Amino acid sequence: MFSWCALLAAAVLPPCVSAYQAEPVPAVLSVLTVDRYADDGAPGSLRWAIATANQAPGRHRIEIAAVGRPPYLIRPASPLPEIKGPVQIVGGARDVDGQYIVIDGSAYVRGKGTDACPGAEKGQFGANVRTTTLPGLVLRDTQGVELSGLEIRNFCIGVLINRASGNELHDNRIVANKGGAGVMLTGDDGSGQSTATTTVHNRIVRNEFIDNGDGLELTRGAAWNLVADNLFRSTDANPEPSQGIEILWGNDNSVLRNRFENYSDGLQINWGNRNTIAANTFTGNSIGVSVSGRGNVVDGNTFSGNGIGIAVRPQPRSEANRFSANLLSGNGLKIERCQAGGACVPGQPRGAIVFGVPGLEHASFVGSRGLGVDTDPSKRARICAAGESANCQPAPNHGQAPPRLLALRGGDGQRELQGEFAGTPRSRYTVEVFGNRAAGSDEAERYLGQLDAVVDGDGHGRFRYRLPPDSADLANLTATVTSADGATSPLSAPLALAH
């Protein structure tokens, strides 16, 4: 019997290749052992190992041995050579006794706090000013670099990934890098302009980021990168607790299952598009997530004990960003930590989801924009007041108003929520329903479910939602609505449940 499958296979597969053939076995790498911590360039030093591996990218693995007793400390006297991949650089102690090999920049990054770390513009210093100054390890115009088992501390930028793709940083500690970020992924072309497709498919997983200015940045074209299972923590020792992660003109990145503690903003998106922020935990931040841009998805995260859970910032044109299935409780605290972010405007509304929160780009922002940055309010954008539209920025998410929860009908496990909302005529919306156990809560402690609702020709939408059986312990309900293009409203006013 004639086989079209066999003919097709013969046509598209080279000789002796099966569709089920495993990928080739990786070549055996030559190991360069670092067993001398003096920074003199001699064989056995880290400087020697990087320079040697750079001569033949793809052929070496650098293993840094644990010499003596911890802490295992390498203190470079001057900037190390940029790293050319593919290459692995591994601190050997972590998998043995949990210790890290420390690469410490304090021998040549000198000065008090952020003053040691000037930005690219003269007179500017600190996090959230453009900079590539004094990094520890540099991956520039390269690919395939793997870093693990390292503690990188006391630089202006711990690891700079500049126009570099397909790299992986895992199981490291990134500590007290004060001027730019713990790890900076940027497509910066050298003059501050973005480059597309140069800083993609990097993986930053299972690292600890402690007391950096910004923990991590995805900026100027950084796209399709994964940041997962990391801890971003700021303590009282941090002089400039800015963002756990800043995304600036970065698109299509995935930030998953991380924890963000005690920053001005846990995560800040500045005109980034289609980024996915999912299954993370935000606590103790002035703002959990601060959003501008379009098509971003904030889904299934937990926000507790923040000033604002999700802050949605105005921009020149109102764009749609989606917030779905997030758990929000205990927010609304007066956390006035405003280092290039946060919520410090007197009388600022706080709580679960707040529209119209000013950022650095707005004249009404209160806080630090970075040392040396021009603060003239006449050069900043105005946020439109109610009923205003000229020379100001409109409400975000198309100004989508929250739904109104009208009544609860039925009983004995058959309770049905009834509500209404305003929307675009003849269009579909998604309603998400939440519950709270505390009678005074107006947040979204528990996610109950969702339903679709259609708006009639007069712009009026109605919905009914049957509550699940496990909702008997709830004191009240709240809800959001999301348009077909992904613009989510703030939470509704709560509707009390009679027991």
Which residues does each predicted region cover?
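Electropositive phosphate-/nucleotide-binding environments in soluble metabolic enzymes
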Residues: D40-P43, S292-R294, R317
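Extracellular beta-strand/beta-solenoid scaffold signature
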Residues: C117-V138, N154-N162, A176-T199, I210-A222, ...
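Consensus "Asn ladder" position of solenoid repeat domains
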Residues: V145, L150, N167, N172, ...
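Bacterial N-terminal signal peptides
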Residues: S3-P15
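Residues that flank catalytic or metal-binding motifs in active/ligand-binding sites
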Residues: G85, T133, S165, V200, ...
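Edge beta-strands of extracellular beta-sandwich domains
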Residues: G486-A498
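N-terminal, post-signal-peptide segments of secreted/periplasmic proteins
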Residues: C16, Y20-G158, R163-S165, L327-P349, ...
